[in-house]
Amino acid sequence: MRRSNEARREILSAIRENLTRSARGREPRGIAPGSAELGKPTADPGPAARGSKERGDVVSSFTEQLAAVGAHWTVVRGATEAAHALAGILTAAGARRVAGSDAPLVQRLVSGLGDGFVRESLEGLSRAGLFACDAGVTTAQWGIAETGTLVLESAREKNRLLSLVPPIHVALLSTSCICDSLGDALARVSRASHAITLITGPSRTSDIELTLVVGVHGPQAVHVLLLEEEP
């Protein structure tokens, strides 16, 4: 088992190094080097990364790509706005049964939903119960501006099935955690994460006749709540 873990670390390290080569020599825009908790960078990103214009550019690129891949997004400031936005998304979609990850912010928002919702606890939730959920709520640790992709790390929260099984996935992402490229994002992924989930819009598949079907192998809809720091 030890040799297997060492081999996995070596492979992931090689992938990170190769993907980040293209990003060397340019400053990532609007991104803090790491975040142990959503929206709380652990280190100073430097003057170039802190510039509001640069950060605005990378957020704009990200939202443009979200729209291009069929995802929806809403900018919110603080937990109160996020709670209202979450309730609105679920109500508009007719989603009643909701499960949230173990991330503290997600737990706070899901537990605050009104009586019109059935709030499922992730702890002890059966496979059948998970498939009966209308929506799954998680955080995303990183966003990739080039492709409108969400990056979810296994070391940060229990979220993998919640982002894949329910027909609606709602992800909370700090605007300070949006990277330019996949290489930038992987350079910031926690070494403790054994699995990384990359989500680019709702699930899509097509047959040999190129008939596109949405939601067969994953969520039919992806909503991203972009959290900005309150002034």
Predicted regions and their residues:
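The feature marks the mature, well-folded catalytic cores of soluble enzymes
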Residues: 1-231
